[in-house]
Every structure is written in structure tokens, then in C-alpha cells.
């Protein structure tokens, strides 16, 4: 997300980066909206969606959350945990797909197996224009790496495979694809991050 925000800002986009906790420094000129939970991220993105041209959901949002979060750290001796009940978090990307009008929507899929099959299924289910998929178990790819190897899938069923590249270069390739979308389905200035771009 940070590489995308930097690349979009360098192209002249007005970028809002909605980010969970990280040690990364926001790119210069990018507005940061920090969040800590999936619900906070949902509220931040949904509240700004109407004035956005392009939304790129690059964050790996947790699929589940504890049903009853503890107010403080649980001590093993005082209250041993024998089970943990989980509830599904809201599907932010699907909600954006249902709400959108002319916005461009780009999703990400971090997979560990059957990469393209799962990515194509997610692209259709979420209603996005592009889906960026990567195998997070592959060497040099995924979280905590400065490089990534991805597929970029579109709604016509095409899947472009990118070689292992620096994440900033991957970000530029993704933005290049955004600019190939038909007028009216994209902004002339793409935005990025798990974030938004204000309409002018």
C-alpha cells in the first residue's frame, strides 16, 4: 500500500492512505489516516468513498475478530484460555463493490495455494475492476519483502504475470493498468494505498 501511495502521489494524485499499524513512514505529500481495527478501516474508507475516483484495497484485513475482546492482557495463570470464539469481520471490498458508481476499484488477494483460481473467484465475488494476486509463500514475495511477484487480473479474464520486481515498480505497473480502463471507470489521476483519491 505504501509503494502504491508513493507512486500515485508522484503522478500527481491526491492520495489518502488508510493504514493499520506499521513501522513504515508515509510518503511525503500523502495524507495518512491511521486505524487499528478492521471496523475502523471500514468506517474510514466508506466515509470517503463517495468523493473518491480510485480505491486500491491493498491491506490484508483480518477475516475474523474475537467475539469478546479482553480489556487487558490475559494471564496464563489467572485465566487460562481454553477456546477462542471468533466472528467474521465486515467484507470492506465487497461493500465497496456494491456501493460504487463510477469509482475504479482494485483489490488484492494474498494466497497460499491455487492462486489464480482463488483470485478469479474473488474478482467476480467482490465486483472489482482489477485484482492483484500474489503467492505469499513464494521467495521474495508478499509481506515483509521489498519485492513482489504478482498477477494482475481484469474483468475480461486476462491475467498478466509480472516477474519478481521491486514493490515500487509493481505499484507503477498496477497504476499503468488502472489507466487502461475505459473513461468513466477510472480517474485521470489514480490514487492508491488502502485509500482513496478525492474527486476534483
Region annotations inferred by a language model:
Residues 1, 88, 92, 170:
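Catalytic-loop motifs flanking and including active-site residues across diverse enzymes
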Residues 1-37:
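Glycine-rich phosphate/diphosphate-binding loop of Rossmann-like nucleotide-binding domains
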Residues 14-16, 31-32, 53-55, 103-107, ...:
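Structural motif
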Residues 22, 112, 157:
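Short, glycine/serine-rich, charged loops/turns that create anion-binding
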Residues 22, 45, 49-53, 178, ...:
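Structural signal for hydrophobic packing residues in well-ordered secondary-structure cores
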Residues 37-136, 140:
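Glycine-rich phosphate-binding loop
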Residues 100-102, 115-200:
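Glycine-rich phosphate/adenylate-binding loop
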Amino acid at each position: 500500500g505504501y509503494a502504491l501511495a508513493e507512486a500515485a502521489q508522484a503522478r500527481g494524485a491526491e492520495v489518502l492512505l488508510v493504514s493499520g499499524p506499521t513501522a513504515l513512514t508515509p510518503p511525503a505529500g500523502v495524507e495518512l489516516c491511521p486505524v487499528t481495527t478492521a471496523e475502523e478501516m471500514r468506517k474510514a474508507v466508506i466515509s470517503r468513498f463517495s468523493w473518491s475516483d480510485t480505491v486500491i484495497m491493498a491491506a490484508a484485513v483480518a477475516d475474523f475478530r474475537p467475539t469478546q475482546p479482553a480489556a487487558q492482557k490475559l494471564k496464563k495463570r489467572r485465566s487460562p484460555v481454553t477456546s477462542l470464539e471468533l466472528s467474521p469481520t465486515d467484507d470492506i471490498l465487497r461493500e465497496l463493490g456494491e456501493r460504487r458508481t463510477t469509482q475504479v476499484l482494485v483489490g488484492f488477494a494474498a494466497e497460499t495455494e491455487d492462486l489464480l483460481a482463488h483470485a478469479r473467484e474473488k474478482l467476480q465475488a467482490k465486483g472489482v475492476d482489477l485484482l492483484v494476486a500474489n503467492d505469499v509463500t513464494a521467495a521474495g514475495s508478499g509481506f515483509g519483502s521489498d519485492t513482489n511477484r504478482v498477477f494482475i487480473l481484469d474483468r475480461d479474464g486476462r491475467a498478466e504475470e509480472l516477474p519478481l520486481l521491486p514493490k515500487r515498480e509493481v505499484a507503477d505497473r498496477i497504476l499503468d493498468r488502472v489507466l487502461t480502463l475505459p473513461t468513466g471507470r477510472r480517474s485521470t489521476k489514480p490514487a492508491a494505498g488502502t485509500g482513496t483519491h478525492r474527486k476534483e
